[in-house]
């Protein structure tokens, strides 16, 4: 029994065929080299062969630097049969070789000059003469794919089964290169279809491996070729076409009248089904199972792998794994002779999407494998986690820990190994750290090369002022760069975090440098010289974040101002999603919506963003961004999410903007995400939210991503609401609390135009807006007790409300929101960390 961890990816015959391919490439290169005549020599030779007088005066001993005689040159430079005849009558030998090892006949055959070939043969050239690599003229004709030349040579006595230095016949070569017409001619002249090459490979093996269906049919027709012939590693043709995914050849060979043995094994114990699964050939595997039954499904190779294990080793075709699991003969927790499962195989090769799929479908991560190379008294039992750790697949280690126990049970970088000695493994693993460092260096070098020069900054160009924010990446400063007030996101080195800051930095810069939209934060440049100096510089947005405005400064905005912000954010997101390479933000929340002093908004912070095409495995394995605003499909990691995940987050931001409350403020972020994902709970929609917007909200946070609207539709509907804001405002009955019709029609003008709301101006209307909202609900005694006058102070309004307008956390809430009733019964946390 072999050790799975030492399973070779290439067989001995693979290595041999690679050498054979290289040798034939060298032969072709040498032939081309002989036929490349220098320009000055070529003109002289054209004159010699174009003039009888010049030809008669030329010396028979004439040779080029590459050793070509006049006979060779006649084949290379446009000579004719009379020149050939004359030169040979004068005693020039046709057997003379060039320095590259070829006689004149080989050059004539390679150039497919039938006239010269015939003339040389009639004048005494040896049709069986071997040149470089033991190749005869017939081999050269087969390599070049010249069927007429092949026929002429065979008519003049060439041995149809002659073998070269690697024991390939012309039929081997024709099958290898896919020359169908040459194959037909060779078969017509009696070529042996079952002759073996150096490693026992027949022409049928070669054609099956290369996928030349018509040649396979030519070889098999009339029961000429042995369809069950084995090479030195016991491969049959079905092994090769299954391995390389040639479905049409597999179907042809599995015809009942050909009597192919579909469950035959090679010296490694692999059936054709094993090889199809090792290479992710779903259609081939399905064909084999449907036509031949399930016998191959239960066979183990010498590395303790069934076909299911093989599919997990390949790991990139989950549909194939699903198909195999649907067969009654397959158990997801089947253990090979060494104890390893399909989950072990997937973990060892770093297939994180497959690992998650297997775990979700009942794979047992606590089953252990043993090292077969150890004696029975030295058991080294290892779970799949240890296999992943050994290969440096730290993301899989973290994922397995997540499935093993709640996230907060152990420190984030430790995991107790079950089935082992109880020791802890830390993340990153040694190999994982090396992989990460190598990838990071490559990413930085690539970014430096691709980033336009105008975005390259030196740290000396930046003037740092006060700190305006911080995060796991480092700190954000206000500063000055190139005569602009800017925000500087300064990264710090973090060697203990499994999530690479360098990776995040490179991704964010590569995305920001391609963005240009008034509703997306403007990129100024980045410092790339050294990881210790990494910094991203963007425009400074003076109004701060929407989160700060709503929940720290506790400002109340009128409906028009809210809609202006909502439209701007939707426009920014629409831009991201409509790019040639669409970008998914993945972290859209009120922290990352920044406000100008004029009340407009931009989308910011692209540290978690990805180009949609590059999501691949990362798409399934990360929970990017803030849990409280996370789409269910992202939180559950149950499917490949799309740009519609951003629409869900936007809907929560819109609700937050309209109500002034944090979504599920009574819950921790993870609990809020779990409630939305698993219990389909959504924030309550109060009467203060206009009906057109409430309808948009419900569609935006639809559990099914396909049911959510595109941002283009969101923009259109919100702009309609903005133009009709007077008709939707709860306070529209009192003109003192709303904008004039003319100003509401200005809402679609370009930024900075007249009639714009100003965040600073809104602060003076804070108490008035609250009073207007409270007055509009005086008919609802359950919600509001004492009537509140517009001129009352914040403290007086708090005392006058049955349910506090400003709670103990300092948040102002919609008095009609059902969240009040819930929050009074639940004490919760406003912590918004991941």
UniProtKB/Swiss-Prot annotation:
Task: Specify the enzyme's EC class, one word.
Answer: transferase
EC id: 2.7.11.1
Q: Which residues form the Protein kinase domain?
A: 462-722
The cross-references to CDD domains, in alphabetical order and at most eight, read: PKc_TNNI3K
Q: Mention any one GO cellular component term assigned to this protein in its UniProt record.
A: nucleus
Annotated spans, Disordered: 815-834
What does the subunit section of this Swiss-Prot or TrEMBL entry state?
Answer: Interacts with TNNI3, ACTC, ACTA1, MYBPC3, AIP, FABP3 and HADHB.
Any idea what this protein is called?
Serine/threonine-protein kinase TNNI3K
Q: Which organism is it from?
A: Mus musculus
- Taxonomic lineage: Eukaryota, Metazoa, Chordata, Craniata, Vertebrata
Gene this protein is translated from: Tnni3k
